[in-house]
Amino acid sequence: FLFGGVEMDDAGAGPPAPMDRRYSKEEVWRATEQIIDTAVLCEGLGYDSFWLTEHHFQYEGYEVVPNGILLGAVIAERTERLRIGMAFNIVPQWHPLRLAEDFATLHNISGGRAILGVGRGTVPREAEVLGTRIGSFDNPDQAEDDRLNRLQFDEAMQVINLALNEERFSFHGEVYDFPPPGIPDRGDFVDELTLVPQPIHPFETWQAVTSPPTLEQVPRWGWGGVFWNNHPTFTRQNWDRFGEVWEEAHGRALERGEKRMLVRCVHVADTYEQAVDEVRPGHDEMWKFLGPYGWSKGYMGEDGKPAAPGLIPGLEESIDQKIWLVGTADDVGEQIEWYRDLLGVENLMLFPMMPGDSYTAVEDQLGRLATDVLPRFS
């Protein structure tokens, strides 16, 4: 999984501030080409899947892919086996039927290799420009924005599921009305729609799980849940609750790692000390960028409860909390094995490129992981 950003020679905890960065259109496009090349490399190294993200208007250079489905089509043309996922399509920022059409096209053109990854969004600059609002379940001041975002997401996903799976469909909700009444068509009126194309291969749907309501909803829908940036104690609680809700909803117990995916930032070097030195600038740049959006709320505070909003963790804290896996190949392998023992992890998404890293560095990381770490789990 890559954020997909521009190379930076000044990443780290100090200046410049994220909002003070600005990159040229040529630098942004060069990063886009390097992302595609990295996907091709992943296929050659034997990785199962390659995940892109969706972000908009990021002149700061951290995440320069606005449409992972479109870029995924290019990757599909240049690969034969690699599965292509979106982590995540921000559903409320799309017209749901356009998202369904585009996903079905990618899935079919790739021979069934696309993975539908969905999320609700985190960035107001993107959300409010593209037709939705962003709130926070645990912030009373934003509760109404959160409610509206969830309503929009829920209805959009109902539309998408109908469109992808039913030959004919209609949907009439509070937010979406498809087809709206009174559309004339050759002497009659339109009362149902058919998506063209529809998927001709089975597909998976995965959603980021970052709040209690989402934890209750995703397994009821029958999708996979993606867990990231949480202390293992919180991850285990959520992981187990996901399984409980799944069994309640579907009458079947999941295997320990089934329908759940763990995401971990990772960095491998010849020695532990070297790994720490190499990853620190990207780690610190990442939290300088993401901390204000509340991404560190899954860290554990000194009282054993979730960390206070706005925490900017240091690298040692991220390592101690087992949220970042850093060290030699043996160190990282042992930490992955620890998570397999704790959770039964079978779906592991690795994040080997920190903000600002060079694509030469990520090529090295992917090679080390594929050669020195992952074979022990095959």
List PLM regions with ranges.
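An alpha-helical appendage that flanks or caps ligand/catalytic pockets
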Residues: 1-23, 137-195, 234-345
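Acidic (Asp/Glu)-rich catalytic clusters
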Residues: 43-44, 73-80, 103, 107-113, ...
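Alpha-helix-loop-beta-strand connector modules within alpha/beta enzyme cores
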Residues: 62-86, 152, 367-378
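Hydrophobic faces of well-ordered beta-strands that scaffold small-molecule active sites
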Residues: 1, 50-52, 83-86, 114-118, ...
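A conserved active-site cap/scaffold subdomain adjacent to cofactor or substrate pockets
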Residues: 208-234, 238
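Active-site mouth loops of central-metabolism enzymes
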Residues: 17-33, 89-97, 199-210, 266-269, ...
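Conserved, mostly hydrophobic/aromatic
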Residues: 42, 46, 54, 75, ...
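N-terminal beta1-alpha1-beta2 module of alpha/beta enzyme domains
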Residues: 1-81, 203
